[in-house]
Amino acid sequence: MPMRMRLSRDERRLRLLLAATEVFGEKGYRKTEVSEIVHRAGVTKPMLYRHFPGGKAEIYMEVLDDHLQSMMRKLGEAMAKAEAPLDALRRGIDAYLRFAEENPEAFHLLAETSAELDPGIVDRLKQVRTTIADGLAETIGAVLKEADLSDEGAPVYAHVLLGGVESVVAWWLETKLLERSAVVTYLLTLLWRGFEGLPRGGSRIRLELSRIIDLPRVAEAGS
């Protein structure tokens, strides 16, 4: 009978985190049992509690923070390559969709909205959404200012966009009816439709959008 290779402490911890990401992503926080995580990881329950004394809540928070940092890093890297605020918005949306496509379980973790979550986790998820919404508001505000428009409504647009994007991504991951680039185009076009109705500057935003997405194709599809 072959001997089982002994895992290092770091390897066991990583295995637990990967297993927890999968199980939480599939079943949600409340329906997940510690026994399912250790079974998926191939370790014992005492081993999980040795690494995470707080049990399910602690490992959930650890997984959440790991993926949050990864997502924010990828968003930041993508948006840093932009030459203008509107392009930064496009790159940010695309990076968010790419992250969800490559890490579906992590996306479902970050989009968790269960009313049965522990208060500490609810607070952390609120912080996550606030961080993302604040970044969106800053970028949208820059887009509006560049078009000589008031940025007062930027936080409103940001929260609408964030909620809409989360819903769209959940649908897209399940159906994959469109290419990622097409989803990004339609989301940006939806913003353009709204900005176009503003009293001043809408035409300038439309011009900038036409340089980074295929507006004629979208307009044709919507006619």
Predicted segments, located by residue:
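N-terminal intrinsically disordered/low-complexity leader segments
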Residues: 1-11, 199-223
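Amphipathic alpha-helical packing segments from all-alpha helical-bundle domains
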Residues: 72, 119-145, 155-163, 182-185, ...
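Hydrophobic alpha-helical connector segments
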Residues: 62, 76-105, 161, 184
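Short, structured helix-loop boundary elements
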Residues: 13-14, 34, 57, 61, ...
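Generic hydrophobic, amphipathic alpha-helix propensity
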Residues: 12-20, 37, 59, 63-71, ...
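Helix-turn-helix
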Residues: 15, 23-58, 62
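Short coil/turn segments at alpha/beta junctions that flank glycine-rich nucleotide-binding fingerprints
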Residues: 26-30, 82, 103, 147
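Amphipathic alpha-helical segments used for helix-helix packing
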Residues: 87-88, 101-123, 137-141, 167-174, ...
